[in-house]
Amino acid sequence: MSGHSKWHNIQAKKGKMDAKRGKIFTKIGRELIIASKEGGSNPDTNSKLRDVIAKARANNMPQDTISRAIKKGAGELEGVNYEEMTYEGYGPNGVAFVVSTLTDNKNRTAGNVRAAFSKHGGNLGETGCVGWMFQSKGQMIIERNEDMDEDEIMMVALDAGAEDFESSEEVFEIITTPESFGEVREKLEAEGFEFISAEVTMIPDTTIEISMERAAGLQKLIDKLEDDDDVQNVYHNAEFPEEWEG
């Protein structure tokens, strides 16, 4: 996938996220609760929590909302117990999907995810049926401007342990292992760089190009899944046309 096409897909997703800001805060709040519950409420000693806090800040989540979620996870405030569940399957046109969820009711979530796939031309599969097509990677996106020195950003990222660095007219994309994500992000933040997005994600090894004629049908499935409060992330290997507006 070309850098420009990657950015187009990221940009389209970001536009949708901006329109659903309250829902995004709810989803990130659940991630904060889980991270705090599993590793404690101190980000200095909990790298997973540090990473989720960075994701929250990249999405302009208010600090008091972040703090409340962390306290719920640590048991300092009353909260709900969530379980992590992952679903895999195929959407229309053979597109592979990995759907990560945090739920307080596994039966409800499984039913909703299965119904979304069935209604929009897909099939929910067994665990592992498509997961092998993706790799867990840290991904940071920095919006490019004329004052930025590409070589400087690249050297900071690579020296800190980044695996890959790509640039386009609009953005710089930095890829890391999940283990080195936090360190690379912190080094870039220390140099004053701000992120459009910064998170550990699932990146497909190969992508399927989707025509304009088929894009709308696939987008309906993605939107249906992302609209579910229990769904945290929807990963797929579709590459939408550059002119697709979602």
Swiss-Prot record:
Its main location: cytoplasm. Keywords: Cytoplasm, DNA-binding, Transcription, Transcription regulation. It is found in: Cytoplasm. GO terms for biological process: regulation of DNA-templated transcription. GO terms for molecular function: DNA binding. Disulfide bonds: none annotated. InterPro entries: Integrase-like_N (IPR017856), TACO1_YebC-like_2nd/3rd_dom (IPR048300), TACO1_YebC_N (IPR049083), Transcrip_reg_TACO1-like (IPR002876), Transcrip_reg_TACO1-like_dom3 (IPR026564), YebC-like (IPR029072). It holds the Pfam family TACO1_YebC_N. One of its GO terms (cellular component) is cytosol. Belongs to the TACO1 family. This is Probable transcriptional regulatory protein CTC_02215.
